[in-house]
UniProtKB/Swiss-Prot annotation:
Membership in a protein family: Belongs to the UPF0210 family.
InterPro entries xref list: UPF0210
Coiled-coil region list: none
Protein name, UniProt field: UPF0210 protein Hore_14430
Gene3D superfamilies the UniProt entry points to: 3.20.70.20
Disulfide bridge map: none
UniProt-listed HAMAP family: UPF0210
Quaternary data: Homodimer.
SUPFAM superfamilies linked to this entry: PFL-like glycyl radical enzymes
Length: 452
């Protein structure tokens, strides 16, 4: 039973510690929109998105006002467009991306995800068309996000896809060079991608999902940091217990919003994603939580252990607070979106190699990392290969969202604005991986993938 102290504590978390609901994401199946005529398929897509999501933003605002819990983003995730558009005879899928963008603008959401393909074992014709369309699709749209799954623990790593995505990322940066390569901030390459992720840029509506669903992503690094301030100097047992209790309260807020949105929109509730999602705002940082545990600067020795503790404790506390947990559900470490991470990079305590180590124990992977515009496509592909290998071997989701910023070099900065923040350009190894990436083929699945 709730007591008055807990109610006041939750109010304080919202007012002073930047607790919010990061996103309400509506997943919509577009499988029945496929048609041999691209024009008909696009009309079907547009009409269906408006039919289901027409009231999403209004309902989210009503809940926000009624309960006093800020809901930062309203988003849509759709069936991977490579599946929906494949039956059309069109040579590229750019117009499909523009249709998604138009529909998203009409209903008023911040982003729409699902310009996606699943190619962990190989490419279909539709997959190839979609991947080749990504650079111009992201350059021509404002709200569309793209994701490609190149590996799974059960299938291994499709190195042909890894190689191709390095080139696509470079081309996307060139196509959006007037905005600092912004298109790459809306493009993510996955291993073991979840089908119910509410966060961008990796959200899409999986083929095992219902016709329509509501998924919610929480936030609240500031609330966790504030709680840890009260146990300064105490043992890690106490630290873990404190994070668990705070995560429970944060997730309860997410569960409340998800259930209420589901009821008002007459759409099934899917999952709450337990990921601690930072913002560029001061005091809303995952890096600062790690430093509160006793690290001088994020990236110092001990950072990976601190992050492992945080990630595990958030899951334990959050799982108790929601009937259905899913998505990515862990701590995010996006460099440009976390004020503490940005400071750590500038201080020199955090580099690409340390971030890769940290991704072994947390959610997602190398996220929102800016590198010099001169970085070769093969090097980007090799970074992707390293990161997805961590996911495949450890049976977890990993991903890469990397921005080779045109015209920028190590030490420069690029400003993306809003939740995407500011990215310091980080150093990448100058040694070549071209011969390695040039081999192609597939890296086989690990032996422990054979579970049956």
């Amino acid at each position: 039973m709730l007591n008055p102290y807990e109610i006041m504590e939750t109010i304080r978390m919202i007012e002073e510690e930047k607790l919010d609901i990061r996103t309400i994401t509506m997943g919509i199946s577009l499988r029945d929109c496929a048609h041999p005529s691209g024009e008909v398929a696009r009309k079907n897509i547009y009409d269906k998105i408006l039919r289901y999501a027409g009231n999403l933003v209004e309902v989210a605002r009503d809940i926000e006002l009624e309960y006093g819990i800020p809901i930062i983003n309203k988003r849509i995730a759709v069936t991977p467009i490579s599946l929906v558009a494949e039956s059309s005879s069109e040579e590229d899928f750019i117009k499909f991306a523009e249709t998604l963008d138009k529909a998203a603008g009409e209903v008023g959401v911040d982003f729409i995800g699902g310009f996606s393909a699943l190619v962990h074992k190989g490419f279909t014709t539709g997959d190839k068309k979609l991947i080749n369309s990504i650079p111009r699709a992201l350059a021509n749209t404002e709200r569309v996000c793209s994701s490609i799954n190149v590996a799974t623990t059960r299938a291994g790593i499709n190195m042909e896809a890894v190689s191709r995505m390095g080139k696509i990322i470079k081309k996307t940066a060139r196509e959006t060079r007037d905005k600092g390569g912004l298109g790459c901030a809306k493009l993510v390459v996955f291993a073991n991608v979840p089908e119910d992720n509410p966060f961008m840029a990796g959200a899409f509506h999986g083929i095992g999902e219902p016709e329509c669903v509501i998924n919610v992503g929480i936030s609240g690094p500031g609330a966790v940091k504030a709680a840890l301030k009260k146990v300064k100097g105490q043992k890690f047992d106490t630290v873990a217990e404190t994070i668990k209790k705070t995560a429970f309260k944060i997730t309860r807020a997410g569960q409340l919003v998800a259930r209420e949105a589901s009821k008002r929109l007459n759409v099934p509730f899917g999952i709450v994603d337990l990921s601690l999602a930072p913002t560029p705002a001061v005091g809303d940082s995952v890096a600062e939580i790690l430093e509160e545990m006793g690290l001088e600067s994020c990236g110092a020795p001990g950072t990976t252990a601190a992050l492992a503790l945080l990630n595990d404790a958030v899951k334990k506390g959050g799982t108790m607070a929601s009937s259905h947990v899913g998505g990515l559900s862990g701590a995010f470490i996006p460099v440009s979106e976390d004020a503490g991470m940005i400071k750590a990079v500038k201080r020199g305590s955090l580099n690409l190699e340390k971030l890769e180590a940290m991704t072994c124990v947390c959610s997602v992977g190398l996220d929102m990392i800016a590198v010099p515009g001169s970085t070769k496509a093969d090097t980007i592909s090799a970074v992707i290969a390293d990161e997805v290998a961590i996911g495949v071997i450890n049976n977890k989701t990993t991903a890469v969202r990397i921005i080779p910023v045109p015209g920028k070099d190590v030490g420069d900065e690029v400003e993306f604005g809003g939740l995407l923040g500011t990215a310091p350009v980080m150093d990448v190894s100058k040694f070549s991986s071209s011969a390695f990436i040039g081999r192609g083929g597939r890296i086989p699945a690990p032996i422990h993938s054979l579970k049956n």
